[in-house]
Amino acid sequence: MAADTPVEYIKHHLTNLTYGKLPEGYERADGSVVQEATWTFARTGQEATDMGFMAIHVDTLGWSIAMGILFLGLFRFVANRVTEGTPSGLQNLIEMTFEFVQGIVRDVFHGKNPLIAPLALTIFVWILLMNILKLIPIDYIPSIAHALGLEYFKIVPTTDPNATFGMSIGVFLLILFYSFKVKGVSGFSKELAFNPFNHWIMIPFNLLLEILALIIKPISLALRLFGNMYAGEVVFILIALLPLWIQWTLNVPWAIFHILVIPLQAFIFTVLTVVYLSAAHEDH
């Protein structure tokens, strides 16, 4: 692996495979100079940073899509082989997951919308599958990628804020959509202006409070998931720096602990999403 010191090793494992645009005249790590602005893969963490906001984390995007396809494929496979007799282990697992998420929606969501349960199921399973990638030993996939010529390669999408913010912004847009659809422009505007203090003189304060509360929802969703998964990833990386005999004594209990953290974070994101959408469906 391209890392000579512990610091370089940590930075290497926390850097995404980044594709972006380097400006004309940019001097790359190998000393070459970009003759004209061009899209390319970053060779160093600094190059990835210099590519700016429009750069794409290819590994995050690829693994996110792969887990989405796996989710759809698993459920399609089981749906086509549903039996009325004794179900298979996979069918049992899918049915338990479905009933679990359905129970969340039944307990938390108080409106009438047939799309909420499928949405909650998609969010829960998708995040769960992305989180499970954390249990793959830290060096396995990056080593294969490095052998294929890819300098950087992260495999856990939820350790990238781009992925968690992407999902939370999607939830935020749904909150706004259903707030306007269910309550109407007038009803939603009144809710912002007259809540929590129902007096015209408090309208500016109410608007400030409610708009901040709206904005905080996607930010807290994204940062909670990212923070927990990123911190766990850092600990796995630090353990990998230790002598092999110490690694096993720490890695196993930390991995067992993460078997609890992985579904818990998917559960929290799903529940909060349903709570926020339930509030958006409440017509005052």
Curated annotation (Swiss-Prot):
The chain crosses the membrane at residues 55-75, 116-136, 165-185, 196-216, 234-254, 255-275. GO terms for biological process: proton motive force-driven plasma membrane ATP synthesis. It is a multi-pass membrane protein. It is found in: Cell inner membrane. PROSITE patterns: ATPASE_A. Keywords: ATP synthesis, Cell inner membrane, Cell membrane, CF(0), Hydrogen ion transport, Ion transport, Membrane, Transmembrane, Transmembrane helix, Transport. InterPro entries: ATP_syn_F0_a_bact/chloroplast, ATP_synth_F0_asu, ATP_synth_F0_asu_AS, F0_ATP_A_sf. The keyword Lipoprotein does not apply. Pfam families: ATP-synt_A. Gene3D superfamilies: ATP synthase, F0 complex, subunit A (1.20.120.220). GO terms for molecular function: proton-transporting ATP synthase activity, rotational mechanism. GO terms for cellular component: plasma membrane; proton-transporting ATP synthase complex. F-type ATPases have 2 components, CF(1) - the catalytic core - and CF(0) - the membrane proton channel. CF(1) has five subunits: alpha(3), beta(3), gamma(1), delta(1), epsilon(1). CF(0) has three main subunits: a(1), b(2) and c(9-12). The alpha and beta chains form an alternating ring which encloses part of the gamma chain. CF(1) is attached to CF(0) by a central stalk formed by the gamma and epsilon chains, while a peripheral stalk is formed by the delta and b chains. Belongs to the ATPase A chain family. PANTHER family: ATP SYNTHASE SUBUNIT A, CHLOROPLASTIC (PTHR42823:SF3). Key component of the proton channel; it plays a direct role in the translocation of protons across the membrane. This is ATP synthase subunit a. It comes from Marinobacter nauticus (strain ATCC 700491 / DSM 11845 / VT8) (Marinobacter aquaeolei). The gene is atpB.
